[in-house]
Structures are given as C-alpha cells and as structure tokens.
C-alpha cells in the first residue's frame, strides 16, 4: 500500500470489513473505535453505520456498556435512519445501563428533533419522558410523554399515553366520515385513472405503485376519500399499502392503515385482533405473497409448518392452496397461532416473537434475558434487547395493532392497560 494511502478511511473500512469476514470481531471493534475519533478518520460515516449498530449490540450482549455507549455515540452522522437508530441506542445505554439520565436526555432530544414518522416520534417522546423521569424532572417527563401520546398508532405512543393518563385516541377506530370520493379532486389526475385501468386489467401490483404514489400528494381529507374507495373495492392489501405510505408522511388514516379483512367473518381459535395484526404484519393482506424464505400467503406460513399443522388439526395438506385459498391459509395460520398461544401462555410478546423468529428462539431469549411475563423483568428492555432488529420491530408492530384492531371491531379497546397486556395472558386460545 502506498504511504499516501495508509491513513485512507477507505483502506481502514476495507480492513474493518476483512476482519469481520474472518470472524475477528474484537479486532474489528478496536479499529472502529480508533477511527470514530473524528468524522475525517471515518471518511463516510454512513458506510460504517450499519456494522456500527451490530458491534454496539455485540458489546451490549457482553455487558460492556461503556464501550458500547462510546461506539454508539461517536457515529458522526447528522440525519437519516442510521442516525436515529444510533442516537436511540446511545440514549438507551446511557439511561438503562449506565444510569446517566442527563446524558440520555441529550440523545433522546436530538432524536425527537430529527425524526418525522409517527412510530419514531412516539419512540423519541416516550424515551425522553423516561429519561426526564429518571432525572427527577416530572414536569418535563409529562411534556415528553404527552408529545409521544399524540402518536397512539405506535407502540411507544400507547405506552406514553398510559404514563400520563391520556385516553385512547378514538380516531384510530376508523369511523371518520369523509366526503364522497366520486367528487374528490384526485379523481381528475392521470395517475388515478391509470390505477383504475390497471385494476380493471387485473394488474394489482402495478396499480399499487400508482395509488401509493398518488397518496403522497394528498391531504388527510383526500386520503380518507381514497381509503373509502379502496374499502368499496374490497381490497384490504391496497388499503394497507396506501395507509402505510400516508403514515410515512405523517398522516394516520386509521381505516386504510388498519384495514379489516374478511377473515374476521370466519371463526378462528384465537382472537380476531391477533389474526388481523399478524396477517397485516406478515403479508400486508397480500394472499399471493411468497417471501424469500418460502413463507406463503396471507399468514406467511412455511410449507413445513403448514404441513405439520394441517396434520394436527386433521385437514388435508395442499401446498398450492396456501397461495390460492386465503381461507385455507388463515385456517392453518390460526391453528398455528393457537399452538403458540398455548405454548407461551397467551402472552402477545412471546407469541409474536415465536411467530416471527421461531418458538425455539423465543425460549432461548427467555433463558438468556428472563421471562417478560414476570414482574422482575422489564418487558420493554426485554424486547429492545432481542438481537434481531426484524423481530424487535415485529413484536412492536403486532402488539400496537391489538388495541387498534379491537377499536376497529367495536370491542373493548384496552381490557387491561397496554403495559399489562404486554406481560399478561390475554391471548389464550378462545377455547380456554
């Protein structure tokens, strides 16, 4: 290597990546810490950010919290998803592991001032409230929690509302009335006309692209009108996709965002809100979806799991029907959920963890981190310490959907507080 390039950030990153590939994790961490002393030494901080998160989690798993904080907080980013994640990690470690709430407040404040989506705003406000509370500043904690509680479509927004006694947001029941969509201004746009032509031509995937693009330019009232149209078309998948795109731009229109699916018209062995929450998260109600891992259909059932479950409930197994018959898929998915519910005592956190990552991993996390159903274990910390980002996110998205779907179904929204639901046994099979 030429002398002029020995201090190149690009060369350092290549060395870092090589060490990781060779399993030299400690040496990779040492190199990352050394180059995190300045933005100049990193060159392009964003290139290091994803592996930085992984290394921080690695150190947290080893209980090397000071080193983990140092690595998380010296990211030298100023915006974006990686910035938000690393600022949150810095604040979490400072608050929950180093017991330094004032330090945590700095990170959670930066997070709150940077993020935009309801999920992230709820998260930032809740943790800022926790940090202020730990520092003894009850007034500031209440302000932060109240801010987060504006976003009750999110996991942390629900928890924050509970902290300050704010009632469930009734708009999430999805009963808002909007003017007739026929007279909506967006019906005159070419992108809308194209989407209808594509739906008529049985090209729903292409129609989805046009409709989600259209939704980005609509105000909440027009989004509600578009949601009403999609409900009339009886396409819950398109409803969810438009609802999610709107949410990414800060607009929560509950009816499409938490669309109902006709699966609720058929009896299942578990609560309807659990079926809806899982199906929405798994496939976004797309009955023909096949994942990279081979999971199929509405409930994203793996063929092996489906075959075993079909045998247990004494129905004929047909792998093709997992994609061609959503009712068949839901029957098997519901039976599998009931099995997980019995295994994990009706606890929504463990059911979701097991459905996403497998029951053996859920049991392993109980063994390593404690049982989240017990008072001695902080269930929020338990979720946040799961090593897989996908599973952490999955648990939050499923559990936050439960009270909202109960509201959509006209049922009692919170039979117990949301925090108690997370540790409780409220989702036992209906036969029990």
Segments (PLM) and residue ranges:
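Solenoidal tandem-repeat scaffolds enriched in leucines and small polar residues
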Residues: 1-48, 54
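TPR-adjacent "capping" and linker segments in tetratricopeptide-repeat scaffold/adaptor proteins
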Residues: 2-7, 40-50, 79-80, 176-189
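TPR repeat positional signature
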Residues: 12-15, 52, 87, 125, ...
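Alpha-helical segment of the N-proximal tetratricopeptide repeat
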Residues: 14-22, 54-62, 189-206, 210-213
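Residue at a conserved register position within TPR or TPR-like alpha-solenoid repeats
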Residues: 19, 59, 94-95, 132, ...
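Catalytic glycan-binding domains that act on GlcNAc-containing polysaccharides
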Residues: 27, 39-48, 55, 62-88, ...
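Outer-membrane beta-barrel initiation region
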Residues: 154-169, 177-204, 208-209
């Amino acid at each position: 290597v030429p002398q002029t390039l020995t201090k190149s950030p690009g060369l350092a990153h290549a060395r870092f990546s090589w060490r990781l590939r060779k399993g030299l994790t400690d040496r990779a961490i040492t190199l990352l810490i050394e180059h995190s002393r300045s933005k100049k030494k990193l060159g392009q901080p964003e290139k290091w950010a994803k592996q930085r998160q992984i290394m921080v989690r690695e150190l947290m798993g080893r209980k090397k919290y000071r080193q983990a904080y140092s690595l998380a907080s010296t990211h030298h980013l100023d915006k974006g998803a990686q910035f938000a994640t690393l600022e949150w990690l810095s604040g979490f470690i400072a608050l929950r592991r180093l017991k330094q709430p004032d330090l945590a407040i700095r990170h959670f404040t930066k997070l709150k001032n940077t993020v935009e989506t309801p999920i992230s705003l709820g998260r930032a406000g809740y943790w800022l409230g926790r940090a202020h509370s730990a520092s003894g500043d009850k007034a500031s904690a209440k302000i932060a929690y109240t801010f987060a509680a504006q976003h009750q479509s999110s996991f942390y927004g629900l928890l924050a509302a509970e902290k300050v006694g704010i009632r469930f947001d009734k708009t999430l029941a999805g009963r808002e009335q909007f003017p007739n969509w026929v007279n909506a201004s967006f019906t005159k746009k070419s992108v809308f006309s194209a989407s209808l032509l594509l739906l008529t031509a049985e090209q729903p995937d292409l129609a989805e692209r046009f409709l989600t693009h259209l939704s980005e330019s609509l105000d909440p009232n027009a989004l509600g009108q578009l949601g009403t149209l999609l409900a009339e078309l009886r396409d819950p998948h398109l409803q969810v996709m438009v609802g999610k795109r709107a949410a990414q731009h800060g607009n929560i229109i509950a009816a499409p965002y938490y669309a109902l699916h006709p699966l609720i018209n058929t009896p299942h062995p578990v609560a309807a809100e659990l079926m809806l929450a899982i199906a929405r998260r798994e496939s976004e109600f797309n009955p023909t979806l096949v994942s990279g891992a081979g999971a199929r259909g509405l409930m994203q059932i793996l063929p092996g799991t489906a075959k075993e479950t079909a045998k247990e409930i004494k129905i004929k197994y047909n792998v093709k029907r997992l994609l061609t018959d959503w009712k068949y898929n839901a029957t098997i998915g519901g039976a599998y959920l009931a099995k997980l519910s019995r295994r994990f005592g009706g606890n929504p956190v463990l059911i979701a963890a097991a459905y996403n990552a497998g029951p053996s991993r859920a049991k392993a996390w109980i063994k390593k981190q404690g049982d989240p159903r017990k008072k001695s274990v902080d269930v929020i910390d338990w979720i946040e310490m799961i090593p897989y980002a996908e599973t952490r996110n999955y648990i939050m998205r499923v559990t936050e959907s439960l009270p909202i779907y109960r509201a959509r179904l006209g049922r009692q929204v919170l039979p117990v507080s949301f925090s108690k639901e997370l540790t409780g046994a409220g989702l036992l099979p209906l036969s029990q």
